[in-house]
Each structure stands twice: as C-alpha cells, then as structure tokens.
Amino acid sequence: MKPASHAHRTEPAGTVIRRVEWASELDRVRRLFRGYRDWLAGHASPPTGSGPAVLPALARLDRVIADLPGVYGPPGGDVLLAVRGPDVVACGALRAWEPRVGEIKRIYVRADHRGPVFGPKLVRALLARAEELGYDRVRVDALPSMEAAIQYYQEMGFRPIPAYWAHPVPGARFFEWSAAERAPVRRGRGGAPPRRSGA
C-alpha cells in the first residue's frame, strides 16, 4: 500500500484526505468528535440493540474530547480529515495500542455526506498513516449494527479476532489488519506506549 503524503492525499471527486493541524484545528476536531458522540448516543436507543451499554463509552468519549489531542497526537497518534471544497465532512483517528500495534477510532462522516465513500477512504488513508508511524498491525472495533463498516473492513483485509478489550456493547466485533499480508511499504520510526483501555 502506498503511504499517504505527510501533507495530504487527493481522492476522486475533489476530496482531500489530510492530517489535522492541531495548532489551528483543535476546535474543529472537537466538533467532529462531538458529532461522533451524538451519533454513538443514537445507538443507546432501539432498534440498534446496544441499549444503555453505550452510556459508559459516551462518558469516556467526553473525557477524550476534553483532553484532545491526547492519545491522538504525536508521537503515536494522528487525526485525518476529509475535505470537500470548503467543508470538512469526515474524520478518522489513529492511536497506539501496543508496541507496533495501532488502533483506528472515531470514523465519523457528517450526516449530509454519508454514503459508501468517505468511510473506506479514511480507513485506507489511516492504514497508510499507520505504516508511516511504524505500526505492523492495526486494530478496530465495531458495533454489531455497523454492518457497512464491518463489510468494508473485511474487504480491506481486516480479519476477525477475539476481543482485545472489554467492550461494553454485547456482540461488538473486533478486527485486525496486518502489514505483513501486504506488499512491503516504506515505514516510519514508529513506536507505541503501553497498552491502553479500549474506549
């Protein structure tokens, strides 16, 4: 897989996937993460089946938002933004999980741009960024109701694995992507802090 540019990569239809500029875009990332939180809160109600189990995750996410960039900043993390014209329409985040293992989090697309486009684009870019940071493997979890996301994770080479953290939602799915199963690519000087809690 060809690594993403350190600045940005241009996707079809005028969309640019680029790294966040923390010094000037912290509030923008907070707004996007709050949008993700609101979306996740919708899974606390029927018919998703997640129920109140989502509520602890919402409380943890509130703390994550307050502490940004936190684990999503250097040296082991990053946030990518999808930009179409003047608008930032989606985001995705990467953080360290274990040494040489990263984790994708916070894939969020604004409601007015949802469809089969931005999620896969962001995941591809995050995998390339993970390799730049030196990660050999990348993990991700998904709620059981996230059928489209689960499908494109598997299409991109993620394989199902046992739970790697105590997810509060029954039936949550866990996946891992391995760079060893792809053609060799340029790797950065990555490293990772000790293992973290899942949320």
Each language-model region and where it sits:
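Extreme N-terminal starter segment of soluble prokaryotic enzymes
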Residues: G14-V16
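Acetyl-CoA-dependent GNAT
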Residues: V20-K105, R110-A111, V123-A125, R129, ...
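Short coil/turn segments at alpha/beta junctions that flank glycine-rich nucleotide-binding fingerprints
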Residues: R100, P116, E132-D136
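Active-site acidic-Proline motif in GNAT/NAT acetyltransferases
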Residues: R110-P116, P144-S145
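Residues forming the Rossmann-fold NAD(P)(H) cofactor-binding site
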Residues: P116, P120, R124
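C-terminal "cap" of GNAT-fold acetyltransferases
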Residues: D136-A199
